[in-house]
C-alpha cells in the first residue's frame, strides 16, 4: 500500500503575545498565537555563543481556542501538536499572499500548557493541562472531561496509604471441587 505521507508538527516554545480569540458565525472559537522557539550554539571560529529564534504562527480551533484564550499569556510555555497548512488570501491591493501556519484542531491536535503557576495565570503548578482537541480521540478510551479548579492556599492535603486488595486472614485456598 502506498503511503500518503505524514503532516505533523510538534513545537515547544513561549508565546510572543497574548492569544487573539474570536468567534466564527457558527459559534466556534478560533485563537491565533505566535510561539517562539530558540536554539543556541557556540560558533567554532570565534567561540561566541549564538542564538537563533524562530517564530511560528499557530491557529487553534474549538475548545482548545477557548482554553488558550483563558489561560495562556505572553511568555507562557506551551507544547503544541498540529498540522502545517498554507492558506492563500488577498491583501488590500488584490495581491495574492500566502501564510503558513500550524493548525491545531480535530482528533490529532494537542495543546499542553507547561511551566509553573506564575506563567499560567493561576493554573496549578504541578504538571500542565493536556487538552486534546476532541474528546474520545481515535484509539483512546472516552473519559469525562476533568474540571480544573485553581489551587486553594490551604493546609497541605494528607494522603492516605494505598489500600491493597488482600484476601481476609481466614481465606481458604482449597478449591471445593
UniProtKB/Swiss-Prot annotation:
Motif range (Important for interaction with partner proteins): 172-177
Chain residue ranges for the region called Disordered: 118-177
Domain of life from the UniProt record: Bacteria
Gene3D superfamilies in alphabetical order: Nucleic acid-binding proteins
GO molecular function, one term: single-stranded DNA binding
Keywords on record: DNA damage, DNA recombination, DNA repair, DNA replication, DNA-binding
UniProt xrefs under InterPro entries: NA-bd_OB-fold, Primosome_PriB/ssb, ssDNA-bd
Biased composition (Low complexity): 118-129, 140-164
SSB domain mapped to chain residues: 6-111
A single Gene Ontology CC term: nucleoid
BP terms from Gene Ontology: DNA recombination; DNA repair; DNA replication
Known function: Plays an important role in DNA replication, recombination and repair. Binds to ssDNA and to an array of partner proteins to recruit them to their sites of action during DNA metabolism.
Subunit-level organization: Homotetramer.
PANTHER family per UniProt: SINGLE-STRANDED DNA-BINDING PROTEIN
Protein name per its UniProtKB record: Single-stranded DNA-binding protein
